[in-house]
Design a protein with these regions (language model features):
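Short, surface-exposed, charged amphipathic helix/loop patches that serve as local interaction elements
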Residues: 24-28, 37-114
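Short, charged/polar N-terminal "headpieces" of proteins
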Residues: 1-49
Length: 114
């Protein structure tokens, strides 16, 4: 199959997180539209994290996330992706770390297959 150079430099990827809720850690899943960043950017972020260098995960998440699906509010209504909604999501403890880790794993698997 031929590689198609797409104009849309993003990809959808499932995210699974476990967040404290009523004395348990139920799994929550949704889909995130990640930006395809340069190889250098991805390597820099991954290397810093692997080397224990502090990384502003909220700032990274804001750079790499372009949208989402399957996120709802308390009443079950779909939450549209906006910068303000992303800020709200990133205020949840551990969320930025989970989102960045998922992006790194998704891009690493692509590199492994090539």
């Amino acid at each position: 199959m031929a590689f198609v150079l797409k104009k849309d430099p993003t990809f959808m990827w499932p995210v699974a997180v476990e967040l404290a809720d009523d004395g348990d850690y139920p799994p929550f899943t949704f889909k995130v539209r990640y930006r395809r960043m340069t190889q250098e950017y991805a390597r820099d972020v991954a290397t810093k994290l692997n080397d224990g260098i502090e990384v502003d995960l909220v700032a990274v998440a804001k750079e790499i996330i372009a949208g989402w699906d399957e996120i709802a509010d308390d009443s079950g209504e779909e939450v549209k992706f906006t910068p303000k909604a992303l800020d709200q999501l990133l205020k949840i403890p551990t969320m930025a770390a989970e989102l960045v880790a998922t992006w790194i794993n998704a891009t690493a698997k692509v590199k492994e297959k090539n």
